[in-house]
């Protein structure tokens, strides 16, 4: 055996030993690892180091399957009238008498969040930026918050 073969055998042996040491370390600290993961589960929703967003699979909401930031629903302050739920699709609306639509407004941010991310399946959406109302104040506001 030449010196190059001995070098590779030593490196391979060291690598295998490190794997065994890591495996034993995980085995010894498995309880602590589970406790750590349970404590820090709230950080599941943060971005990972690789840049891909991690999804919080414990709670399903409307933004889980959307990757475009402008399409995600958010609660924003509406000028003088509380909070509204908005995305590039428009505003969430209330349907009144004679099928009239008005933007659904909330008194507090928490009410807006609770409604926007609840399990409501049928949501009416009003997009003020669809012709013929492209230059109205509601459309300008929607563009400004996206």
Swiss-Prot record:
Transmembrane residue ranges: 1-21
Family annotation (Pfam families): Pox_A28 (PF04584)
The entry's keywords: Disulfide bond, Fusion of virus membrane with host membrane, Late protein, Membrane, Phosphoprotein, Signal-anchor, Transmembrane, Transmembrane helix, Viral envelope protein, Viral penetration into host cytoplasm, Virion, Virus entry into host cell
UniProt keyword annotation of Transmembrane present: yes
GO biological process, one term: symbiont entry into host cell
Record membrane topology: Single-pass type III membrane protein
Post-translational modification: Contains two intramolecular disulfide bonds. They are created by the viral disulfide bond formation pathway, a poxvirus-specific pathway that operates on the cytoplasmic side of the MV membranes.
UniProt entry tagged with the keyword Hydrolase: no
InterPro entries in the cross-refs: Poxvirus_A28
Family: Belongs to the orthopoxvirus OPG155 protein family.
Assembly and oligomerization: Part of a stable entry-fusion complex (EFC) which is at least composed of proteins OPG143, OPG147, OPG155, OPG086, OPG094, OPG107, OPG104, and OPG099. Formation of the viral membrane is necessary for the assembly of the complex. Interacts directly with protein OPG107.
Protein name as catalogued: Envelope protein OPG155
Species for this entry: Ectromelia virus (strain Moscow)
Name of the gene this protein is made from: OPG155
């Amino acid at each position: 055996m030449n010196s190059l073969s001995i070098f590779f055998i030593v490196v391979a042996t060291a690598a295998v030993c490190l794997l065994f040491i890591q495996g034993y370390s995980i085995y010894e600290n498995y309880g602590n690892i589970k406790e750590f993961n349970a404590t820090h589960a709230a950080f599941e929703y943060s971005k990972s180091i690789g840049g891909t967003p991690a999804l919080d699979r414990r709670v399903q909401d409307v933004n889980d399957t959307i990757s475009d930031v402008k399409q995600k629903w958010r609660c924003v302050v509406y000028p003088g009238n509380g909070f509204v739920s908005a995305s590039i699709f428009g505003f969430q609306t209330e349907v009144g008498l004679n099928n009239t639509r008005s933007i659904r407004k909330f008194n507090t941010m928490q009410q807006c969040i609770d409604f926007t991310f609840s399990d409501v399946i049928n949501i009416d959406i009003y997009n003020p930026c669809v012709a013929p109302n492209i230059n109205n104040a509601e459309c300008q506001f929607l563009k400004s918050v996206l």
